[in-house]
Amino acid sequence: MGMETLRNRLKELRARHDLTQEQLAQAVGVTRQTILSIERGNYSPSVLLALSIARVLEVPLEEAFWLEAENGRQEGE
């Protein structure tokens, strides 16, 4: 197994729900800076936080977060 990176589409999903970073942060109990860092890929959330975010955004975990291999392919392709 090669190097993998956790990717996300939080910004897109927040827009669908008309949520700001601050509103999502409050809903899951973190700071706006934490949401910003997750969106930018600078911080990988705990499983508990990722599940909480997915629940608030009303999507399966895999729709909000996924692993991407070093070669750019999504895990499982």
Q: Language model features by range: what are they?
A:
Residues 48-63:
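DNA major-groove recognition helix of helix-turn-helix/homeodomain DNA-binding modules
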Residues 40, 59, 69:
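Short, conserved catalytic or interaction motifs in soluble domains
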Residues 18-37:
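Short alpha-helical DNA-recognition segment
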Residues 15, 26, 55:
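Alpha-helical residues within the helix-turn-helix
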Residues 65-77:
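Short, charged recognition helix plus adjacent turn
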Residues 8, 18-19, 45-48:
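Residue-level signal for the short linker/turn that defines the boundary of a DNA-recognition helix
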Residues 1-16:
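A short, Lys/Arg-rich alpha-helix, primarily the initiator
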